[in-house]
Amino acid sequence: VSAPVAWLLALLATLAVATPLRAQGVLAELSQREVAVTTGFAGAELLVFGTTAAELAGPETDVIVSLRGPNAAVVVRRKVRIAGIWLNGPSEQFEAAPSFYAVSSTRPLETVLSAEERRRLRIGLASLPLSPRGQIEDPTFRQALIDLKTSQRLFGEDPEGVRLVGDRLFHARLFLPSAVIPGPYRVDILVVRDGRVVASRDLPLTVVRAGTSAEIWRVAHDQPLAYGIAAVFLAAFAGWLGSVLFRR
C-alpha cells in the first residue's frame, strides 16, 4: 500500500470511531499545517487526504480541493510598441487578488458544478473574484493576471488531481512554489453529488519565514537604510572579488 493510501486508511480507522462522521459528511487532514520558507526554499508539496460519510459514497460523488493564499494588490501593465520600442502602456490594479490559488478535482469542474454554482462558490480560475480598481473593467487585464500567475505556478487547475480510493477515501497533492508569500492559507474541501455541494470542510495552513530568510526579511523591513547600505557593500565586494579572480 502506498504512503498516501496508508495515511487515508489510518485516518478512516481512527476518526470514524472518535468523530460523528455522519453529521459532518467529510473528514480531512493535511500532511502538515505549517510550511517554513527558509533561504534555500524550493517549494513544498502538500498532501490533503480524507474520507466522506458512508451515505455519500458512490460513483455520483465528486470531491473538489482548493488552496487559497492571502490576498495582495497586483498591478498588470500592457506593453505598447512606439517607434519600434516597447514601453509600459495602460495598467490596471487589482486590490485583492489571491497571491496563490490552486484547485484539484476528481473530474473537470464544468462537469461537476454548473457555471452559476462555480461563480457562487468562487471555484475555479474563471470564477475568482478579481475586481480591478478602475471604473471600466477590461477582461484582457484579468486574463493577463491569470496567465501571469499561472506561468509562475501561483495559479493552477488540475481536473483529475483528486484521487479516490474505493468509494469514500480521497487524496490530492498540491504544490507550493518558492514564490509563495508568508501568511494564512486555507484549504477547502467540497463533496459534490448530483451538482450540489452536500458536505464541506476547511483547514488552515500557515506559511512562515524561518532561519536566515526570516532575519533578512526582518532587517529589510525594520531597518531599510542599513539593509540598503549592506546590499550595496556586498554587491561592490562581489564585483571586486570577481575582477580579482578573473585577472588571475
What are these regions (language model features)?
Residues 19-23:
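Sec/Tat signal peptide C-region and signal peptidase I cleavage site
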